[in-house]
Amino acid sequence: MSSTKRQIPLLALAIVLLLACARFQVAQTPTLFSKPSEPTAQSLFEDANGYLGRKYQEFNKQNLPYDPKLEQRTKQEQLNLARQNAATLQARKKLKGDDLYYLGLLFHLANNGDAALSSMLQFLKEHDEGSKAQAARTLVVVYGTKTNNLAAAEGAVKDYRAHQPQTAEDLYNIEFLLADAYQRSNEYDKVVEHAEKILEAAKSFANANRTDTFKRDDMLLKSAIMLSNGYVKTEQKPKAVQMFADLRRLSVALPSGSLYKQTTIRLKTLDPNFDTQKLFEDVSALPKTTLPDIVAAQWIDQHPVKLADLRGQVVLIDFWASWCGPCRYTFPKLVEWNRNYKDKGLMILGVTKYYGHADTRPLTPGEELVYLREFKKRNQLPYGFVVGDSNVNELNYGVLSIPTTFLIDRQGKVRFISTGSGEEEIAELGAMVKKLIEEPVSPMSASESSEKN
């Protein structure tokens, strides 16, 4: 039953990982003729927590097709087991230490938030260090914000920040829960206080996680939206505009076409008169960019190149697909720019990938490659194609929609991102191509020369 796999909720996954780090074993000395020992609190939790995994393995061995009713029934069985094991553990006298911790986790599995909160608060009275304490604090925030016990949630966040281990993702999650709770109660000064910390955590996550681009962009955008709402509600709209402008600048540095598009939309909504081109006018203000190389399974009418090899040229990277109507709308301009500027240093790379179909027909990679060659010839596209066999290029450049175009100057800096094929977008892109071509060629620095070599 392979299709029954489901994503673990983010916070639950963090707790599972913290448990893995904090796992311990208690040595026991067997006694001759002793009674069977009762299951430990940890084993009771692991029995319930691992129930779904065990059942899904059984279903896979039986080659059962996905059945939503079976999935629902299996989840209910896990819930019942968690309740049963929690009752077994709770019936024991004078629980303390890790017993309280695992009891809290069992109540969490059993969807008993009040009991989970109570157990974790008792556990934290005795234990304030280590992975288990940090996991307990995340649950206190979850159920504190659900039950409007914001004092407990605030205290747990403060204590989480004061102890280790901690992660940017956990900080993002618990601060977000608090900000959201204050937003529901219209306490917008508190929303701003915690949303600023959410954005800080999202940026820390972005710095440390260069590969999980979609999660990175989602965290950055959601935190910015939360903070923007707080600023607007507290009559600090200029701060909201500046915050999105800064995030838009970050989207160029990452780079991320999706984040760039979303921040541009938000800026225009907040301030219709905002000059979205100003970011690209001051070259010295642009962040240093380390661009990922384009990963290719095949090159069409273009020898393999690395971006570092193209320093000294203006590079236009166009993400497109043969089935994309708006992408085709840009072809005449791409052909025109190639004709006008190729000899002046413009290189265009059309980046696509194998989609497994074309013109409503399923195609093998070999057949699709033949189709792309014929498509290129039929549409008289004079620039090279880059064909990927995975989503790696889209992930690296944060591309969620096409066409998306990145324009890179002769020093290797992203100077413009275009996300769409409207007349305004195409006109702006064309103006930037002309501007970069006409910029004087700067001597290559020693560091740039060594990087290229």
Residue ranges and their predicted role:
Residues 24-98:
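N-terminal leader/linker segments that initiate helical-solenoid repeat arrays
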Residues 88-98, 110, 124-135, 147, ...:
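Short solvent-exposed coil/turn linkers within tandem alpha-helical repeat scaffolds
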Residues 107, 143-144, 182, 224, ...:
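Residue at a conserved register position within TPR or TPR-like alpha-solenoid repeats
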Residues 377-383, 387-434:
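Thiol/disulfide oxidoreductase modules built on the thioredoxin-like
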Residues 249-297, 308-311, 441-453:
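N-proximal helix/coil linker or "cap" segments that precede and/or mark the start of modular domains
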Residues 304-328, 334, 348-349:
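Short active-site neighborhood of thiol/selenol oxidoreductases, capturing the structured segment around
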Residues 68-85, 108-119, 145-158, 188-204:
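Helix-turn-helix repeat elements of alpha-solenoid scaffolds
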Residues 174, 329-379, 386-395, 431:
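Structural microenvironment flanking redox-active thiols in thiol-disulfide oxidoreductases
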